[in-house]
Amino acid sequence: MRTLWIVAVWLMGVEGHLYQFENMIYQKTGKFAIIAYSNYGCYCGWGGKGKPQDATDRCCFVHDCCYGRVNGCDPKMGTYSYSFQNGDIVCGGDDPCLRAVCECDRVAANCFAENLKTYNKKYWLSSIIDCKEESEKC
């Protein structure tokens, strides 16, 4: 189901902040998120359950938790303000909700970059059915 959703979004043309998040990830890792992170482990992609499989999957778990704490807007819609300054992502703008979404995305993109060396292709295209352990709390 999560793969179908990701493909549907990709085919529609990614709008708003999902495109921005993709760009952040590419700038920090050199990887295209839709390919590398849309169906990785138990948490990267649509939904999530179980125990994160590795450090990269934990980045997605933390990102999901961060989105869960955002109030006042839909974390997957809208457009936020950000820039790259000296290799760092800097979130801006006046809307506190969109700024919070940007911060969630910034932290995740940095986390992916910090864990590039441990990215394991065996978790790419893994099935969420394999994520049977009890989910952690945020």
Swiss-Prot record:
Cofactor note: Binds 1 Ca(2+) ion.
Protein name, per record: Phospholipase A2 EC3
Lineage of the organism: Eukaryota, Metazoa, Chordata, Craniata, Vertebrata
SMART domains: PA2c
Residues reported in the UniProt entry to bind Ca(2+): Y43, G45, G47, D64
Active-site residues (renumbered): H63, D105
The protein's Enzyme Commission number: 3.1.1.4
Species of the source: Echis coloratus
Signal sequence range: 1-16
